A protein has these predicted regions:
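GST-like domain detector, emphasizing the conserved glutathione-binding G-site
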Residues: 28-212, 219
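A contiguous, mid-protein "functional segment" used to position or interact
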Residues: 88-92, 269-295
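Ala/Thr-enriched low-complexity intrinsically disordered regions
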Residues: 12, 21-26
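GST-like fold's C-terminal all-alpha helical module
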Residues: 34-40, 173, 180-283
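Short, flexible helix/strand-to-coil boundary loops that buttress conserved ligand/catalytic motifs
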Residues: 169, 193, 258, 291-294
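Acidic/histidine-enriched, glycine/proline-rich intrinsically disordered or flexible terminal extensions
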Residues: 297-314
C-alpha cells in the first residue's frame, strides 16, 4: 500500500512543474487576450467612417458606383484598368509574356486606376467589374466587347484565348495541376494580404493575436510552396504557366523582401526552393516590364503609370 502512495507522490511531483508551466502559459495568454479583447460586438454591426485602418477613407459596406466617370479607351484590342499591386501585376506580366512570344493580339492599353482616390468606384469601372477591384479587362477585339474581372479569371481567359501558358486539353493531368495551383493562389493570398499584411503593416494598432495567427498561416503556405518546388523548376514541373504568373507577385515578392517589410519576421530565407524559383522568375525580361506597368510609386525609373506601346517601357 505504501508503495502505491509513494508512487503517486513521485508522480505528482513530476507533473507539478509541467502543470505550473501550463498554468503560466495560460495566464500569459489570458493577459494577452484581456489586453486585446476589449471590443464587445453589438447585436447588429453598423459602419462608421473609422472602419478600415489605413484604407478607411475608401472602404464602405456597400457596392456600386459612387460617381459618374467614363473610362478612357485606347487603340489596342485589350484595355486594362489596373494598378501595380500583386493582383494587377499578374495581368501585366501575362500580357508582356505573350507579347514577348509574338502574340500581337495581346497588345494592350493599360490605364491607371488609383484605388486610394476611389477610381474603382467610378461608373465606367463598375460597369466592367461590379466588385470594384482591380484589375479589370475589356477585350474589344471582336464585334462585342467582353469584360473580364478577377485576376485569376483574366489569366485563364488570356491563356485560353492565346493557347499559351496553360497545358492543353490533350494534357488533362498537367492542365488540372496547373489550374489547381492557380486556384490555390486565389484561395490562399487573402490570408497573406487581407490577413497578415493588414494586421502587420496597415492596421491602426499592432495586435499580437491576429499577427500570430496569420503569420502561422503564411508560413504554412510558404512551406507548401517550398515542398512543391523542391524537385521541380516551376509549379507545374518544367512548364512556366499561369500558376507561376499568379503566385509570383504575392509569394515571390514576399520572399524577395518586397511585401510588408516582413522578410525577416517571417524568416523567408529559410524557404530556399521558393527563393530559387522567385529569383528565376524575377529575372525574366517580361516580368521586369510587367511589374512596372501601372506603377505610380517608388523610384521614378520604375514607374510606368500608363502603357500604350512597348516604347512606354524603356
Amino acid at each position: 500500500m505504501w508503495h502505491s502512495e509513494l508512487l503517486c507522490h513521485h508522480l505528482a511531483l513530476s507533473i507539478l512543474p509541467l502543470s505550473r508551466a501550463r498554468s503560466a502559459q495560460a495566464k500569459d495568454e489570458r493577459n494577452i487576450m484581456s489586453d486585446e479583447a476589449t471590443y464587445v460586438p453589438p447585436r447588429v454591426w453598423s459602419w462608421s467612417a473609422g472602419n478600415g485602418g489605413k484604407f478607411a477613407h475608401i472602404n464602405r459596406p456597400t457596392a456600386g458606383a459612387r460617381q459618374e466617370h467614363d473610362l478612357p479607351r485606347g487603340a489596342h484590342p485589350l484595355q486594362l484598368y489596373s494598378l501595380a499591386t500583386p493582383n494587377g501585376v499578374k495581368v501585366t506580366v501575362m500580357l508582356e509574356e505573350l507579347l514577348a512570344e509574338g502574340y500581337h493580339g495581346a497588345e494592350y492599353d493599360a490605364w491607371l486606376i488609383d484605388i486610394q482616390t476611389g477610381d474603382q468606384f467610378g461608373s465606367g469601372f463598375v460597369a466592367i467589374n461590379p466588385n470594384s477591384k482591380i484589375p479589370a479587362l475589356l477585350d474589344v477585339s471582336g464585334a462585342d466587347p467582353i469584360r473580364v474581372f478577377e485576376s485569376g479569371a483574366i489569366l485563364l481567359y488570356l491563356a485560353e484565348k492565346f493557347d499559351r501558358f496553360l497545358p492543353s486539353l490533350q494534357q488533362p493531368a498537367l492542365r488540372a495541376e496547373c489550374l489547381s495551383w492557380l486556384f490555390w493562389q486565389m484561395s490562399s493570398a487573402p490570408y497573406l494580404g487581407g490577413g497578415f499584411g493588414h494586421f502587420y503593416a496597415y492596421a491602426p494598432q499592432k495586435w499580437q493575436y491576429p499577427i500570430d495567427r496569420y503569420a502561422m498561416e503564411v508560413k504554412r503556405q510558404l512551406d507548401v510552396l517550398d515542398q512543391r518546388l523542391a524537385d521541380r523548376r516551376f509549379l507545374c514541373d518544367d512548364n512556366y504557366t499561369i500558376a507561376d504568373i499568379a503566385i509570383f507577385p504575392w509569394y515571390g515578392a514576399l520572399v524577395l523582401g518586397e511585401l510588408y517589410g516582413a522578410a525577416e519576421f517571417l524568416d523567408v530565407a529559410s524557404y530556399r526552393h521558393v527563393m530559387r524559383w522567385a529569383q528565376e522568375i524575377v529575372a525574366r525580361p517580361a516580368v521586369q516590364r510587367g511589374r512596372r506597368v501601372n506603377r505610380s510609386w517608388g523610384p521614378e525609373e520604375l514607374r510606368v503609370p500608363e502603357r500604350h506601346s512597348a516604347a512606354d517601357i524603356s
